[in-house]
UniProtKB/Swiss-Prot annotation:
It catalyses: UDP-N-acetyl-alpha-D-muramoyl-L-alanyl-gamma-D-glutamyl-meso-2,6-diaminopimeloyl-D-alanyl-D-alanine + di-trans,octa-cis-undecaprenyl phosphate = di-trans,octa-cis-undecaprenyl diphospho-N-acetyl-alpha-D-muramoyl-L-alanyl-D-glutamyl-meso-2,6-diaminopimeloyl-D-alanyl-D-alanine + UMP. GO terms for molecular function: metal ion binding; phospho-N-acetylmuramoyl-pentapeptide-transferase activity; UDP-N-acetylmuramoyl-L-alanyl-D-glutamyl-meso-2,6-diaminopimelyl-D-alanyl-D-alanine:undecaprenyl-phosphate transferase activity. The chain crosses the membrane at residues 26-46, 57-77, 103-123, 127-147, 171-191, 195-215, 225-245, 247-267, 275-295, 302-322, 356-376. It is found in: Cell inner membrane. The gene is mraY. HAMAP family: MraY (MF_00038). Its cofactor is Mg(2+). It comes from the Bacteria. This is Phospho-N-acetylmuramoyl-pentapeptide-transferase. Pathway: Cell wall biogenesis; peptidoglycan biosynthesis. It comes from Thermosynechococcus vestitus (strain NIES-2133 / IAM M-273 / BP-1). The keyword Transmembrane applies.
Length: 378
């Protein structure tokens, strides 16, 4: 049985206990809900006769492994002084998060990828080159995120890598993955949709395949602004993909293992967070969603289940464009939202972190249910 991680020393127990209990209740609700979904799927698919073929077992192993590993890594990150630098123009309530260890992606991302690679090997009798290629894409994005996190910590400011350099590196990784995908799978340029619709994109697939990991990675990066938000929504989205990808058992395992890894990380990241995933984790999380969607030809389903992430991205784009469009002679424009991304708009409107996170979990769960229903109706 996993022990509850120690309470942060920077707060008194009396002040933090109510928030801790509320955050833990939400975490438990999410964990139980996802567990019920995996058990129901395996029961309906009659997988229990072959435990290695179930979704429940790898999901649980991944969750437990990451949660236990975090008990050693989180204190180490704190000793290494990897404390998060909080943006000065952000919500004032976030200033109390300053000093919380970041770069949490370094322990849940490689653990999930390694377990998925090994599990597919044991379950199918051979290692999956597709899982290996996606793992390389994810590690590339994690490395970009780690470099960005490191620059922020080294400079003690929110200025990490330049946007141009970061996008260039992301584009290189996405292009290499796209090249491998097209070379290894002659049907890679064909995108499927519900009700049997098939879209042969031809050469148009290449720019799309490069864009998707970049868009998904940065969307998750923007979503990672509240305790447990990116980790929880990522766990739901990945499990959704795992459920609908029965024709691709290796990608199914990758999706559910990474979902379990997200939940294991959430054990330490739920409100009030004891560690943040940083760009190391958020960029990697977007990359694994994109890689699975591209390799399985399920870009339509990826778009649906990632709807919240893209709304977060669009809120930032809309805020910038509106500000520029309304700029007056004094050089000051108007804001469309109180603050972008969207979760900060709600936060400044008086919503608590837990209310926002709980609501966003529900939105992604509904989008996931829509994906499953569309797959079933097809």
């Amino acid at each position: 049985m996993l022990e509850r991680p120690p309470m942060p020393s920077t707060k008194t127990t009396a002040a933090i206990e109510p928030r801790w209990r509320a955050g833990q209740r939400l975490f438990r609700l999410l964990a139980i809900g996802l567990l019920i979904v995996t058990i129901a799927y395996d029961t309906g698919a009659n997988h229990w006769q072959q435990p290695l073929q179930t979704l429940t077992l790898p999901w649980l192993v991944s969750f437990a492994l990451v949660a236990v590993l975090g008990m050693a890594v989180v204190p180490l990150l704190r000793r290494l002084k990897t404390g998060q630098i909080i943006r000065e123009d952000g919500p004032q309530s976030h200033l109390q998060k300053s000093g919380t260890p970041t770069m949490g992606g370094i322990f849940f991302v490689p653990t999930g990828l390694g377990l998925a690679f090994l599990w597919t090997g044991f379950a199918q009798g051979k290692l999956s080159p597709t899982v290996g290629a996606i793992a390389l894409l994810v590690l590339w994005y994690a490395a970009i995120g780690w470099w960005d996190d490191w620059q922020v910590l080294r400079r003690q400011s929110n200025k990490g890598l330049s946007a141009r350099l970061r996008l260039l590196l992301e584009g290189i990784g996405a292009a290499l993955f796209c090249a491998w995908l097209v070379a290894s799978d002659p049907t890679a340029t064909v995108v499927t949709a519900p009700w049997g619709w098939v879209w042969p994109l031809g050469m148009a697939f290449i720019p799309l395949a490069i864009f998707v990991p970049m868009a998904e990675g940065n969307a998750l990066n923007l979503t990672d602004g509240l305790d447990g938000l990116a980790g929880g929504t990522g766990a739901i989205a990945l499990l959704t993909l795992g459920i609908i990808l029965s024709p691709y058992p290796d990608l199914q395992i990758l999706a559910v293992v990474m979902s379990g890894a997200c939940l294991g990380f959430l054990w330490h990241n739920h409100h009030p967070a004891r560690v943040f995933m940083g760009d190391t984790g958020s960029l990697a999380l977007g990359a694994v969603l994109a890689g699975i969607g591209l390799a399985s030809h399920h870009l339509w389903e990826l778009l649906i289940v990632s709807g919240l992430f893209f709304v977060e991205s669009l809120s930032v784009i809309a805020q910038v464009l509106y500000y520029k469009a309304t700029k007056g002679p004094d050089g000051v424009g108007k804001r469309l939202l109180r603050m972008a991304p969207l979760h900060h708009h709600f936060e400044l409107g008086g919503w608590s972190e837990l209310r926002i996170v709980r609501t966003f979990y529900g939105v992604v769960a509904l989008l996931g249910l829509l994906c499953v229903l569309l797959q079933w109706l097809a």
